[in-house]
């Protein structure tokens, strides 16, 4: 009898457990609780100009007489000394290498940003000049010699660290990041979307790496100490920039 009672109790427990599991799978358990949200940023002092959109840039500069120029590759080499900090905006596309911007790139940026931005809450500003450097070309099938070719088009040189487009207003990074990232991918040099705080943090990290570097064999010390007569194969450009640039390319791992 005791064995029969135990078996009955076990079978009843199994059946009740199965019923509970079936009920729990079909029923939705509702619960209420407290949730803390982040305080939204204050945009009271945000500056909004009368014309918030990017203006049209001329394809050809308004010169009385167009003059041909040499290549002057130093225009895209090394760090930028102008337009490398924010003025009025909070977010920007920053160049991480040197290169030439054509008028087609500028039109692509202008049309993409102007179509997708909200002019009531944000504004965009150019941080580059219109194309001004002439590039010459010769037609196909011409013989060697005969002097420099005719001017074909104009470009704008860009160096590492220069801001291309700046965006500001009553806006957060999540609202404009996808627009600026889409534009940055199409540029002829590596570029990145950064905020004011990100740019300051990047400069601060570079300065901290230089200050707390424990490796005594840095490029700067080796080059300035002329170890093994290294100075005879180094250019003044490499010595001036402590080997952080090879032409238009930036080497972030160098300290």
Stretch-by-stretch model annotation:
Residues 1-255:
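Ribosome-associated RNA-binding proteins
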């Amino acid at each position: 009898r005791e064995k029969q009672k135990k078996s009955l109790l076990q079978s009843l427990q199994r059946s009740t457990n199965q019923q509970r599991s079936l009920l729990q799978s079909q029923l939705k358990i509702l619960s209420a609780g407290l949730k803390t949200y982040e305080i939204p940023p204050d945009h009271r002092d945000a500056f909004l100009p009368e014309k918030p959109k990017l203006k049209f840039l001329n394809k050809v500069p308004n010169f009385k007489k167009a003059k041909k120029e040499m290549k002057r590759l130093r225009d895209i080499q090394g760090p930028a000394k102008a337009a490398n900090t924010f003025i009025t905006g909070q977010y920007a596309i920053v160049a991480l290498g040197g290169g030439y911007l054509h008028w087609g790139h500028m039109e692509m940026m202008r049309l993409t940003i102007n179509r997708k931005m909200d002019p009531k809450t944000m504004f965009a500003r150019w941080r580059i000049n219109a194309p001004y450097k002439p590039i010459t070309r010769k037609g196909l099938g011409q013989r060697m010699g005969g002097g420099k070719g005719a001017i074909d088009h104009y470009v704008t040189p860009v160096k590492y660290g220069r801001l291309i487009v700046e965006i500001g207003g009553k806006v957060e990074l999540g609202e404009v990041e996808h627009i600026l990232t889409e534009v940055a991918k199409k540029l002829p040099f590596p570029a990145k979307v950064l905020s004011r705080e990100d740019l300051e943090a990047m400069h601060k990290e570079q300065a901290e790496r230089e200050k707390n570097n424990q490796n005594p064999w840095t490029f700067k010390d080796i080059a300035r100490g002329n170890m093994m007569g290294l100075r005879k194969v180094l250019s003044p450009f490499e010595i001036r920039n402590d080997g952080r640039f090879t032409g238009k390319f930036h080497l972030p791992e160098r300290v």
